[in-house]
């Protein structure tokens, strides 16, 4: 339930990077008791880099997250951590205008964070609701 806590740097000042914006969206939508600092050097994959076999479910989530961003970089020749998008936070829900290239990345992270959750993303081709099934279909 804390899979995106490595992004949960609530005490980091705002930056124009999508990774920071996405962290804010997740923290607002699904408040968490842990902070980014508690996971920055956890297991084999939470934090910068990663290798070996994940040590537990949380570390496995970080592994999935790392691979998801890596796949987006390879397949779409982009840097999903830096790609900007706009979002609006209201009443613990998130509405975002997300480039299509990031839909897969966001679905993996949102679903990893809260497996029963769904995310509504507004893409250039229309509104898309992402559920855990999207991960099975996209991976």
Swiss-Prot record:
The active site is at 65. GO terms for biological process: arachidonate secretion; lipid catabolic process; phospholipid metabolic process. GO terms for molecular function: calcium ion binding; phospholipase A2 activity; toxin activity. Expressed by the venom gland. Disulfide bonds join 46-62. Ca(2+) binds at residues 45, 47, 49, 66. The keyword Metal-binding applies. Binds 1 Ca(2+) ion. CDD domains: PLA2c (cd00125). Its EC number is 3.1.1.4. It is found in: Secreted. InterPro entries: PLipase_A2 (IPR001211), PLipase_A2_dom (IPR016090), PLipase_A2_dom_sf (IPR036444), PLipase_A2_His_AS (IPR033113). Residues 1-9 form the signal peptide. Its main location: secreted. It is an enzyme of class 3 (hydrolase). One of its GO terms (cellular component) is extracellular region. Keywords: Calcium, Disulfide bond, Hydrolase, Lipid degradation, Lipid metabolism, Metal-binding, Neurotoxin, Presynaptic neurotoxin, Secreted, Signal, Toxin. Snake venom phospholipase A2 (PLA2) that shows presynaptic neurotoxicity. PLA2 catalyzes the calcium-dependent hydrolysis of the 2-acyl groups in 3-sn-phosphoglycerides. Belongs to the phospholipase A2 family. Group I subfamily. D49 sub-subfamily. Heterodimer; disulfide-linked. The A chains have phospholipase A2 activity and the B chains show homology with the basic protease inhibitors. This is Basic phospholipase A2 beta-bungarotoxin A2 chain. It comes from Bungarus candidus.
């Amino acid at each position: 339930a804390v899979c995106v806590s490595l992004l949960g740097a609530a005490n980091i000042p705002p930056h124009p990077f999508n990774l920071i914006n996405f962290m804010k969206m997740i923290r607002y939508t699904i408040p968490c008791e842990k902070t980014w600092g508690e996971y920055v050097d956890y297991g084999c994959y939470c934090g910068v880099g990663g290798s070996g076999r994940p040590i537990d479910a949380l570390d496995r989530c970080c592994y999935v997250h790392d691979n998801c961003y890596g796949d987006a970089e390879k397949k779409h020749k982009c840097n999903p951590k830096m790609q900007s998008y706009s979002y609006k936070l209201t009443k613990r829900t998130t509405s975002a205008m997300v480039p299509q290239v990031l839909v897969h990345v966001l679905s993996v992270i949102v679903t990893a964070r809260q497996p029963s959750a769904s995310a509504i993303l507004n893409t250039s081709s229309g509104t898309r609701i992402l559920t855990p099934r999207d991960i099975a279909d996209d991976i």
